[in-house]
């Protein structure tokens, strides 16, 4: 859980880091995917990067101790992305509503269709992922709004 009451940015509380550590130790013989709402790494969008996970290093310290983590998935950024760190793939997933324009210094919506990501983690640790977009949407986007 990366939610912080009355905040837009994220934080993983110490108790949740301990809980994650315990789960990763308990299931050390199984490959794992970790999910969180807030993005741990910059998206190269000034406006959204100020709302990322604020204690990324704490999370990475936990992840770095475990070789069974294949991926971390997050939302919050309303766009598809991939980054790799220490052989762990970090994915963001599109929103099922409006998309945020990638690589934007200021808040901006994208005209990309709503979508979602499917992850398939096989017993051998192989990870497959695909993003599906909603076809033929009649979505009307107000590009004049200054926030979401």
Predicted regions and their residues:
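Short, solvent-exposed loop/turn segments at secondary-structure junctions
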Residues: 2-5, 39-41, 78-79, 96-98, ...
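Binuclear metal-dependent phosphoesterase catalytic core
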Residues: 62, 84-148
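His/acidic metal-ligating clusters that form di-metal
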Residues: 7-91, 127, 143-148
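Acidic/histidine-rich helix-loop elements
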Residues: 5-12, 104-109
